């Protein structure tokens, strides 16, 4: 053991030295981390651009945590390069902050207290930090990093996952040098404890445990709950909770739990800067738990706020006492909440995470969390607390949140009661080895579902917006490794137990070491924690990382069968449910949304009379059960409790103890179908009160009418009412109420208006047995009486109005009586009830002409009119039971939907299964709806064609056996979803074996790569007419219907564009509203005791404030104008004598009341109006007028005036004086509609004045003589009077000399008295002397004129047309006419130019009342007038009465007449369709080009050409011209020599077709009739033979000779023109024509030859697995003894090879197809069909979902890329003529320099491009890795490139495409490219200062098959 420890201690420093990290001093946290690692490295990441160029040093880590100021915008993409573990990692990253919401904020309370990693209160903006991308261009190698302050994150590579984080200084600060910042990198799967294998398991003592024990020990509680009412079976009446609003139930809605998470000060001190990240990691686990499918609901955990408490004084008081802490936190979180549920910061529940060691009780600190049951959506109680002890705290938070959802523990009584036992999941009371904390038990699912379905989760329905943020998608174990989880749970220094390593439980050592034992809190390791190479923990199991983790959304399974009926009568319920299991949601996928349960009514017939109440039966099931309640007898009997139960608790089973008022809740819910109460028809379903009708049907609205008939129409009964007011002592019979009576209402008004009364109601049966208030005993309290099933409510006698009422049907006759006692005041009994009508046969009848019902079929169907029962008196539709005794007439039927047909249509056919010979094809058959007039077809459900025989979906076919054919890919998606689009597919030419050929081989075959699709019209919005304004005055909103339709068929709104939806609401405004206004109350009419007071109530216009007639205001809301008043009691009047006057009863004071005035008695002029005036007593009853004599009687008649005309006033005339004061006048006329009438027809009080005074300038003084110089004038002339005139003025304006210097003076002309037709102008003319004084001696003959004519042209006048038609024929309409002001010549002018008042342009008409019950009948729309395109459709609109009889249209003219025609569109018209032109008919010269032209109807396809316009038919043929034809001829070669063999029979020569340039061409271009012979017979001499005797030898033993003999051979003499030689081998003697000499027969040679024979082996397997190959076998010449021999006859030698044919080749074109089809999972080289040629392709990643293809390179040394590293000191020269020289004046400091060779390159076989950035099969020999086909340098700016790349694809079957180009990048970049002739080799030299070349991004590095 000690040796092992010593070795371990020695190996760790050695490993650190090897990694070179001793140079770095780590922060203590990182120091502890590296001690647990098997290896790590310290590296410096380099930021590069997408081409690999290094960024300047100040641009490497530019991202900072933002606070204030204007930040630098982050790049969307960035690239980094890391060299570690002998590999080069290229990180291609893109910004990705999707997991953070736009409004994410933190709330910090208190001043931060520095601690371990203390932080500032300023929350950094983290959005710009986060990036996500790939490593080395591998899509499956993901990388997730934060770039703030360095690179922190993880990435995946071939050998596992790597973690990277900046190295912190020992004091915790970061390195300042951003561009040269050291980073720590380590692999996840290599993390080990350095002593993990040095110890064996040891025992763990109990005294070492803190909160947990080994599984063998007894576990203790880890979650404590305030389980109020959890174990209770019943509760008392006082227990109530708030009623929630109802919504649709039994539907799976998405729920959003908005959570406020609070971290206390201890959390801040412990986690420091990592707090936010850590808390979000915990909540991500919680969110994943609540997304598990086992919860049975779609619940989203959403964090809306994170509150960080730095100072304990700023937050709730947190102590060791769990209950107190929970109470304090609940109070505090309510103050942090926003009440508005729609506010972004509102939270539904609050979670406190604390590191305080909370305790459930004294000395019992094993509690990890606390919450109260069922408090979700309660603002003051929806909260929970959880103790943080590592990542396992997430399970505690989820557990406590489950309690908030009202979920009990998995071992609670409620779970056992439901029959669910031994399931321990999230809600397990304790955590042990058998607990599964990720999933939910069936009990938990049941309670969460019930909690939500019963309306307690309504606050979760709003989807949060704004300040919410997503949780991190990273698995928590990938961020916090196992050792870190131990530290979070048990403190620093704790490590994963080395001998208890499994995912199900996290076992940890103590800080002192493993020798102190291991401990656990029964929590599993976090998901994502490494558990082995390529493995990680997932829900307690160690699984491979490649396990499918994509989210899978759940889908509903089928509905199950309906359950049995819950009741045998009275309306039961059947239910069915479905599960979310097709598939079940996995890996965080969404739970199903929609209805999970359906219900239907059953056994709806009413129960027979006398059957026990259903709720009573359920209570009686508990008879004899007392539940250990004190005071209950053993044989207790339970009765239903109806009254006094809260509305929300009506569906719980409350029962009371018989004989007492005590009641208890015995069950959480009553049986389905139980009525919610006695006063309603609603029934309970699954604990909820659901609507039902009196017919006991769920969701029915049927109600009983006043006759007690369910669904009745009040026509089967009549109402009887009466009054009884006579009194005799004792019981007085009021009325007998017969059996069958319903709606019984009995009132007895107290004579004094007080409850104290001596008259009381009573009920008895016909035998005199009292049922209420009998035997002079009266019930004062309210009560209910059940009389043979009819429930009567009695108000009790202690009411001023005593009341008995019942709505039920009375089954037996009752006698209503009134008991009179005491002073025998007359009773005031008022009663009413309904009794059935006995004789109804002649009251009702069947009407067969009801509304049309739905058509029986979508097309070619029938519909019929509904037969309704109507009342004969008014033809009103009544319930059918009223006509039940009458025979029903025959239905009126009519054909419907005749404009369409339903037919099976073959939409498409597959290709024939056999390419040659008999096969079959599948047919795509659908039901289509064909429009007869529109000419279009729409697919419908197949069920609509169910009455027709469906064509078979398979038909025989025959392959064309063509040698070539077009092979197609799948069709693409249609370019448009409606309105006609196109879809395309790819095609290529193949032969019969599926091998790809040149397209020219198939050019004669039709090629279909484009097809029309989705040619049906798009849905569009349709609108109805605007409704009338819904208000009678003021402002309102009128509306219209807006719907989405397709060819007039309604569709869901989602099918139409929401942005173009027309408005459905529009404001409207009518005349101003009138409202009641009240004045102050007057004085009381009494001075003591009771009286009343009055006030004024007026109807006032809201806008003008004028008083209106009372009829303009709503009478129902008229305020009272009278109220009682009570003053001090009156003094008692002492008695005088034995008798006194009877006292006036209090409240008997009378007053005058009056109604509103009637309309005036005349329509115009003076008349009279009247009103009703009456004397009313205190009860508002009519009293004798003598009782009101003390008050003045209001007038009952008044004079009134209704003006017949109106006053019209003209313009004022000019002032009568030219100066000073005068008068002006105008005309005032009484006009009625432009006609002058007598002034008596106008209101004299409103007559305008006709005369008024006018004032002008003061007049000048007049003098009778000239004053002397000594006299002073008595008046100074006004300044306004001119004293002098300028000479030369005309007569009008100048002065005229007169006698002695006097002259006339004139003033300015006044305004013209008229603007037209001879008006007058006036001016002042005065005589003045030289001094300007008034004189009288001016020459009268020369006096200027005082007036003159003015105004030119005639005056305009009013012109008007005839009155138009009245808008209504009755009920008051309006007619109008055109009124204009114009001159006699017809010229129009402004209206004010006409002097007379404007005649009215509108007036009322047809004021008589309209006839009732008429309406417009709208007939069905006729067919469209056009068979295609736009047209018009018409319908019949008739005026009919209530009996459907046709009337003249004038009777309906007051109603808006519906339109009789509208535009229509009958689908698209057929049109010509022209395909593309085919190839020219000749290859040279003049030919013909054709194309297919046909008539097409969209949606149907080809139709007859007669349907299209022949004049517009496109041309189907045209001439074409190719290049001039070449002349071809046959040419021959020389014949082969026949003399080479005496046996040769034929000779050959070469015959070929050549063009004019003697270039060989295809033989089809030459005339086959003139082709020369290529074969002819040889004429050779016969072969010559000779006999040759060989040396002596022994014959074979079996040849018959035993002595040596000379062997004689027969040989053939070969002769040619130059040589004669012998054949080397003998021939058979039978063929030899030469007879040998006798001595030659020494051996029996013929016998020897026959002994040697050919021997053959077995055929080998075919050389190919598919297609045509070769089979081989061994053939050898052997003797009988098996010896090899040369004596076998060659012509008899069997074949050693032959052709073979394997199965048809399935052309595998990608590694993915190879993986799926042949189930290949091993990486390696495989033969794939690449564009018709079989090539060797390397498949990599065959065990992954998407393997990749690589092209093996024959010579890797010829495939390299280089970035040259030397740089000239003088960059503006090119030394050595551009050659490389090591002795150049250069510096070797170019950082991107590198040299990479490639053994394989990745190819995209679909786009035929090489992925140059893939470096998987590359080796970097020096420097940095360089992508394929890339070169560059920083050598020179003088076009002297030194960087080079080489491509050699020889032997691969591919070449570089001619379209491949290289792009120069950088400064002074130059590119030199050399290609081989066959395209297999490319060499390039690139460079600049600094520059490089890469394949052009637009084309990529394209390749082609040779």
Curated annotation (Swiss-Prot):
Residues involved in Zn(2+) binding: 399, 403, 409
Top-level taxon of the source organism: Eukaryota
One GO biological process term: signal transduction
Location within or outside the cell: Secreted, Extracellular space, Extracellular matrix
Keywords for the protein's UniProt record, in alphabetical order: Cleavage on pair of basic residues, Disulfide bond, Extracellular matrix, Glycoprotein, Hydrolase, Metal-binding, Metalloprotease, Protease, Repeat, Secreted, Signal, Zinc, Zymogen
Renumbered residue ranges of the record's region Disordered: 201-222, 1265-1295
SMART domains: TSP1 (SM00209)
Positions of the TSP type-1 domain: 553-608, 843-901, 906-962, 962-1015, 1017-1074, 1075-1131, 1148-1202, 1203-1260, 1300-1351, 1354-1411, 1412-1465, 1468-1526, 1527-1584, 1585-1648, 1650-1706
Xref: SUPFAM superfamilies: Metalloproteases ('zincins'), catalytic domain, TSP-1 type 1 repeat
The protein, known as: A disintegrin and metalloproteinase with thrombospondin motifs 20
Species the sequence originates in: Mus musculus (Mouse)
